[in-house]
Amino acid sequence: MPVLITAGLSPQAYRLQRILHVSDVVFADNSQLPGIPGISTLVIPTHDSASFVHEMLKACLDHKITKVYPLKLDEVMQLSRARALFSEYEVMLMIPSDDWLKHHTNINVGISENIVVLENGKQIAGTSFPNNFLLSKESGIFSWAIIEQKFEYNLYLIDDAAL
């Protein structure tokens, strides 16, 4: 079953595909992606469109997508409000819990050498990291580093302004 990765114009989307070791990927973005043989692409509305959630769900159902990996913070926040709807259709949003998002309001966009993908607290791809108990029930894509002997982590996101 295919997965959907947003921010399809970004190098982070293709890096995530490599980390996931999946070949059946649909890359989605707000702009038309270049036609690359063997790569499935999709144009989606911007996060602030009234039809964003509806179009994302429709795309998932049309393409039999089982997991969505949003790489833009605004998409994460919009999709978090529709978590139950996607769940009804057995589409997993690979984003942290509402509680985690609420308590991590200073989410920074940064690129890290270390990326881990978690599903309900279990590592499914990426680089193992210390202190898993900090994210023991979370899903999503996280970047992490040890800076001055302190473990730091954040969501793995793209910088919208850079695109």
Would you name each region that the model predicts?
Residues 1-91, 130-163:
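ATP-binding N-terminal substructure of ATP-dependent carboxylate-amine bond-forming enzymes
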Residues 89-105:
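Short, acidic/small-residue loops that bind anionic groups at enzyme active sites
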Residues 102-146:
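Short, glycine-/small-residue-rich phosphate/pyrophosphate-handling segment
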